[in-house]
Amino acid sequence: MKNYHAPDEKGFFGEHGGLYVSETLIPALKELEQAYNEAKNDPEFWAEFRRDLKHYVGRPSPVYHAARLSEHLGGAQIWLKREDLNHTGAHKVNNTIGQALLARRMGKKRVIAETGAGQHGVASATVAARFGMTCDVYMGADDIQRQMPNVFRMKLLGANVIGVDSGSRTLKDAMNEAMREWVARVDDTFYIIGTAAGPAPYPEMVRDFQCVIGNEAKAQMQEATGRQPDVAVACVGGGSNAIGLFYPYIEEENVRLVGVEAGGLGVDTPDHAAPITSGAPIGVLHGFRSYLMQDENGQVLGTHSVSAGLDYPGIGPEHSHLHDIKRVEYTVAKDDEALEAFDLLCRFEGIIPALESSHAVAWAVKNAPKMGKDQVILVNLSGRGDKDINTVAKLKGIEL
């Protein structure tokens, strides 16, 4: 796929994306777009971004050959891009560093964020402390119960965590509240969106900050294996870790790209979070147009996933576009497959993955045996699983 360019000047990726917000937010988004366009062309901005990624986050994150897991499965060699080794334990911090630098450049003293699994909340609280800003994090009440360790982490870092009791009490509702708050305090507040979704320019901006993942991986895989992987795979909720891995590979036609949505209890049930795989129609949510789980009246449907971070009814607009142009294949891993992959990676490699990342590992577990021993699968291990041990223990009937 040569000459891939997106989004267009209106923030559209094909027919997805754009700017669907109330009039009151338009000036804030235009101000943000202008600031980002200036920063994007300022070498000093990127130099500072890279410095922080190196000295604060600990990048580059390594690629690691999961040799014992590969041998156990028989077939393709599985390599992991170790985003779990970043400061704060996931890929989220790549993006929050970039947005915090932008907030500071715009003179904003306060940041707000939404969070599902709590990883983006922790990463936002972390950079707020790093840059001396106040931070409020909106989190669904159900997610707070699932992710208590991360809630406490955010508070330790000085953030105020605001529980959201409306709707499904998960990520979607947290995002609604955060957008409402931004409208109310747009003058002094910067909204750090945690995924490659939301109104323009957020999907492009988040991608640009996250594509450090794929850029590093390309150089590292070349050095480690003398070639690029046959397949690069990542889990997809809103889709920031996935677009970070995929974007630098889009024009590399020999590399198959696979996005793994949350299959929950199965896409033939109502309990999943897989808008593309389940054939959901296009809708508008949180300021952008994309595939969206909704009923015949356009009401957003409830979602289910064992992982709080994939529990989202929409998907980032660039993913919808990459699906439309058939550059990326989207599929699912169900809860039980993700949990099996979680166990396998723990036992064979001594790595406890996030339940989100376990969905991508599950694809490799299922497909590596069907491939040749000389073939290579690169899995984006987007985060570590410390935050999920309570969930997993509960599912195994173990009291912690």
Curated annotation (Swiss-Prot):
Family the entry assigns: Belongs to the TrpB family.
Modified positions (N6-(pyridoxal phosphate)lysine) in chain numbering: 92
Gene3D superfamilies with a match to the protein in the record: 3.40.50.1100
Record-given protein name: Tryptophan synthase beta chain
Enzyme Commission designation: 4.2.1.20
PROSITE patterns reported in the protein's UniProt record: TRP_SYNTHASE_BETA
Any one GO molecular-function label of the UniProt entry: tryptophan synthase activity
Organism lineage string: Bacteria, Pseudomonadati, Pseudomonadota, Betaproteobacteria, Neisseriales
Reaction(s) the record says it catalyses: (1S,2R)-1-C-(indol-3-yl)glycerol 3-phosphate + L-serine = D-glyceraldehyde 3-phosphate + L-tryptophan + H2O
A single cellular component GO annotation: cytoplasm
Purpose: The beta subunit is responsible for the synthesis of L-tryptophan from indole and L-serine.
Keyword field: Amino-acid biosynthesis, Aromatic amino acid biosynthesis, Lyase, Pyridoxal phosphate, Tryptophan biosynthesis
InterPro entries assigned to the protein according to its UniProt record, in alphabetical order: Trp_synth_b_CS, Trp_synth_beta, Trp_synth_beta/beta-like, TrpB-like_PALP, TrpB-like_PALP_sf
Subunit annotation: Tetramer of two alpha and two beta chains.
Cofactor: pyridoxal 5'-phosphate
Involved pathway(s): Amino-acid biosynthesis; L-tryptophan biosynthesis; L-tryptophan from chorismate: step 5/5
